[in-house]
């Protein structure tokens, strides 16, 4: 055997071994066989090659979706255009996270593992979101255009899943063996993750704010609308103080470093009433949409007043990394909060809704929040609907020290309906409710299937720990393989400080948190 053949066999053996840890090993091997050289034999270069392939395949021509739009024969041409526009945006956001992942891999995969896990997982989420949008058109899957888009998104998802699986191996290997201890936070730092800098921490806690601009409806500020203030934002951290009032606006921003501070969660309110029944696509119904990173909100409300008859009607659509909502109110009915992707932290925030009113695929922790069930249009309520599509994603919803209760409109009639802690939107849905107060609005079964998705019961991860109240008993909970009543050794993994599948947005060492069980 020649040296070249031996080298080739060694390389092939190596990639077959590495690819055996992925969900799509055949595609993994096919991808890496195109990168046969000595420099690619290092583990890091294999992962970079896989991400590079995802990037290359994600760089679709600008005409890609518009061509599909013109080919689709649909009654609602406006709806088709909205969906294809949304797909273009999702692909742009996916590409951004893939490119950030590649740069982080090239710098230091071990040091940056948390970021890489989050960004690759988000890229997957954005790809799946495009597919979901296309499927929401209600056209037959036999439609060739629909099939092409769905197949393309599935292919991209498989390409992206493979490097994520390999990065997760690095994360598991480097994670401290004694990872179930309880972290506490020194008191001067408050209850915020370490990526909330000391400056921003003080900003969130300060009784008065030194704002860059002031918004006031009566003309006493720099601007009369929140939209105008955000348009003027510049710099790394731009603080906008919004005086008391109800601001009827529909806002969308991709700017990084925006901070909104109001006079109180029910005193300063940004509100809208767009809804799916009006013909607007689900994501576009949001009163406030944020895709820029580092968004912070304090003492302000985000509402959608479409009511239950409006069907899907979002108050918030959040695809921002390192996001904080502190002492806010988020009010709607169906699909109130779209926690779409990336790392999100909610503290002392009131969230109102009916069906799936916290949904999406972010790595999100809700601490000390008040989750209010409203009277539904349909037959039942479900608080969470997590959209995790890949077991390698570090995503999920953790509800800790929350209060779950019926609202004033629901309490008198709650005996007529069932309410649940959540249902699995996607195959690997993950939600944990712990140390929370649960009133008797919640059904004794606790959780409910997604219609037509009974198989998810084996692949989802739903768990409860140390909850109290008349709705907290677990003896009659669902008997699914994926449902767990956990102990403290497992529950601690889902605290703000130590959410194992979401450690990319939390410190791995050093800073201590108050998130104890």
Briefly describe each language-model feature range.
Residues 5, 108-110, 338:
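Membrane-lumen (extracellular) interface motif
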Residues 12, 25, 58, 84, ...:
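Generic preference for well-ordered alpha-helical elements
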Residues 1-72, 197-220, 224-240, 250, ...:
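Signal-peptide-cleavage-adjacent N-terminal segments of secreted and extracellular proteins
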Residues 40-127:
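Extended, amphipathic alpha-helical segments that serve as helical scaffolds
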Residues 44, 136-155, 160-517:
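Sequence-level preference for short, compositionally simple segments enriched
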Residues 81, 99-102, 106-161, 168:
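Amphipathic alpha-helical hairpins/coiled-coils and adjacent low-complexity
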Residues 19, 28, 86-87, 91-94, ...:
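Functionally engaged cysteine thiol sites
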Residues 24-27, 31, 57-64, 90-100, ...:
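Amphipathic, well-ordered alpha-helical segments in soluble domains
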């Amino acid at each position: 055997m020649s040296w070249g053949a031996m080298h080739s066999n060694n390389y092939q053996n190596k990639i077959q071994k590495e690819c055996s840890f992925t969900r799509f090993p055949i595609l993994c091997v096919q991808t890496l066989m195109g990168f046969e050289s000595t420099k690619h034999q290092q583990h890091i270069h294999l992962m970079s090659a896989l991400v590079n392939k995802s990037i290359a395949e994600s760089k679709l021509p600008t005409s890609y979706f518009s061509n599909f739009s013109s080919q689709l024969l649909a009654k609602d041409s406006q709806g088709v255009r909205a969906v294809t526009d949304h797909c273009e945006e999702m692909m742009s956001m996916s590409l951004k996270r893939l490119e950030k992942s590649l740069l982080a891999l090239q710098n230091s995969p071990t040091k940056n593992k948390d970021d890489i896990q989050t960004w690759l997982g988000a890229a997957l989420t954005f790809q799946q979101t495009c597919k979901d949008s296309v499927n929401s058109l209600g056209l037959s899957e036999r439609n060739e255009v629909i099939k092409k888009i769905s197949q393309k998104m599935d292919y991209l998802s498989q390409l992206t899943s493979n490097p994520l699986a390999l990065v997760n191996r690095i994360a598991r290997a480097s994670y401290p063996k004694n990872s179930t201890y309880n972290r506490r936070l020194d008191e001067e730092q408050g209850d915020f993750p370490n990526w909330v800098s000391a400056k921003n921490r003080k900003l969130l806690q300060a009784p008065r704010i030194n704002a860059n601009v002031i918004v006031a409806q009566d003309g006493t500020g720099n601007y009369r609308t929140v939209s105008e203030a955000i348009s003027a934002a510049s710099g790394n951290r731009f603080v906008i103080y919004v005086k008391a009032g109800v601001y009827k606006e529909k806002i969308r921003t991709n700017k990084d470093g925006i901070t909104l501070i109001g006079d109180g969660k029910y005193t300063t309110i940004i509100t809208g009433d767009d809804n799916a029944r009006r013909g607007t696509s689900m994501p576009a119904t949001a009163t406030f949409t944020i895709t820029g990173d580092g968004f912070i909100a304090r003492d302000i409300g985000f509402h959608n007043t479409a009511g239950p008859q409006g069907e899907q009607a979002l108050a918030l659509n959040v695809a921002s990394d390192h996001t904080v909502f502190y002492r806010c109110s988020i009010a709607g009915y169906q699909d109130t909060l779209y926690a779409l992707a990336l790392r999100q932290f909610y503290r002392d925030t009131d969230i109102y809704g009916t069906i799936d009113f916290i949904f999406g695929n972010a790595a999100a922790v809700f601490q000390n929040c008040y989750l209010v069930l409203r009277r539904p249009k349909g037959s039942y309520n479900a608080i969470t609907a997590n959209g995790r599509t890949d077991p390698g994603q570090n995503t999920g919803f953790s509800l800790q020290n929350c209060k779950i209760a019926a609202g004033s409109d629901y309490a008198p009639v709650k005996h007529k309906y069932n309410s649940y802690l959540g249902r699995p939107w996607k195959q690997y849905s993950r939600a944990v409710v712990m140390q929370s107060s649960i009133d008797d609005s919640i059904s004794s079964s606790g959780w409910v299937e997604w219609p037509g998705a009974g198989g998810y019961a084996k692949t989802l991860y739903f768990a409860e720990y140390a909850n109290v109240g008349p709705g907290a008993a677990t003896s009659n909970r669902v008997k699914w393989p994926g449902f767990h009543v956990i102990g403290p050794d497992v529950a601690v993994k889902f605290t703000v400080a130590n959410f194992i599948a979401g450690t990319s947005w939390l410190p791995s060492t050093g800073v201590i948190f108050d998130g104890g069980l």
